[in-house]
């Protein structure tokens, strides 16, 4: 199955964290035939009243590839990698060594307690959409709402002018 992931880091050696996460995806044979976008640096999203020291820039990228795992198995393995690379159970939007989100899983739509595919907030995040446009511009968004059926390229052009 073809998948797309979003990876981000804003704590520690951000570039190394992204590299190690991709290496773990490959070494653990979770994802094959990987194509990775360029790296994008962006400001952290913060909740109102968040501590000032949480305001650390992220580096993000998108990765597409193929997996033999079902979505829940993939999510479990991704959480294992995040823990292996130092991520703790943390407060929402706090700094993290690594954050890996499943954006897309072939043509599946998933809505469970632990997982929503396509990722529910992806369209509102330029740091997800711009890297994704590099690696799968012609993928047609199959989520709900106005942009269902639009390609990633069309969505990025309309929402972000890029």
Language-model-derived ranges and their functions:
Residues 13, 45-49, 53-59, 69, ...:
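Flexible, gly/pro- and Lys/Arg-enriched active-site loops
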Residues 20-70:
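Short, surface-exposed acidic-centric catalytic microdomains
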């Amino acid at each position: 199955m073809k998948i797309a992931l979003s990876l981000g880091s804003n704590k520690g050696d951000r570039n190394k964290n992204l590299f190690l996460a991709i290496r773990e995806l490959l070494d653990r044979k979770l994802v094959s035939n990987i194509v990775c976008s360029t790296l994008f640096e962006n400001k952290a999203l913060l909740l109102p009243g968040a501590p000032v020291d949480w305001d650390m820039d992220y580096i993000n990228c998108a990765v597409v590839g193929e997996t033999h795992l079902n979505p829940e198995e993939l999510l479990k393995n991704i959480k294992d990698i995040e823990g292996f690379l130092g991520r703790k159970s943390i407060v929402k939007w706090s700094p993290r060594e690594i954050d890996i989100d499943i954006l897309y899983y072939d043509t599946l739509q998933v809505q469970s307690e632990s997982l929503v595919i396509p990722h529910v907030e992806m369209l509102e995040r330029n740091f997800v959409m711009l890297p994704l446009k590099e690696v799968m511009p012609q993928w047609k968004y199959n989520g709900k709402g106005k942009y269902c059926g639009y390609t990633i390229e069309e969505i990025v052009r309309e929402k972000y002018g890029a």
